[in-house]
Amino acid sequence: RTVAESVGRVPKGKKAKVLPYRIHDNPDPQKLETLREFTAKFGYKVKTAGTKGAIARNLNKLMDDCEGKREQKLIQSVALRAMMKAKYSIHNIGHFGLAFDYYTHFTSPIRRYPDTMVHRLLTRYQQGGRSANAKHYEDLCEHCSDMEQVAQNAERESIKYKMVEFMGDKIGEIYDAHISGITSYGIYAEIDENHCEGMVPMRDLDDDYYDFDEKNFVLRGRRHHHKYQLGDAIRIQVAKANLEKRQLDFTLAE
């Protein structure tokens, strides 16, 4: 990280030359407040006001404090929703998550194309070359950011596929699970034993009419006031495993 930070730093008195940076904008203040309120339910006190560096340190401390605890994945999920997405650009704004003013992807075990761009430009500049064409490299940065998202989506879909494939012969089996997501159309549940995730559709929650509280990640019943919220322990039964759609359907077990 130190090398990656130093490579992108502009010496005093020097005009910055074109270079691809790894940038990460400040998080959405409203979403940070939602994160603060959510984590308070688990006993965490997170300060979401102050300087950019202070907020980053507070969030990193939160990740350390919840590590290994049952609510870790839930808190990480809510925290990620508050974060902006990191991307590549020649227009440096710093990297919030790392609390760096300058950061670039300089090296990795598996070579990324942005690393190669940086290597080529450094060689060019060390040999006295002029600053590269800004529009050309910004277009390349945008393309790399887009392809990174494509790769991440492919990774997620492949994981879903293997989950459904694994659970295909377990229809009807009952597992301990916890609620890993709440939406207006149902409950996501993650099986404690194997971490496979599926959905209990809203249509199967037929004991009441449930309203979705998006801010607090809760479903509340209108008549009986029963509620489902992130982290709740539940028992599920595997209902369907649709490999084509990469989708697991659960029902609540009695």
Question: Positions of the model-derived regions?
Answer:
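A conserved acidic, glycine/proline-rich C-terminal tail/linker
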Residues: V218-H225
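OB-fold/S1-family single-stranded nucleic acid-binding modules
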Residues: H226-E254
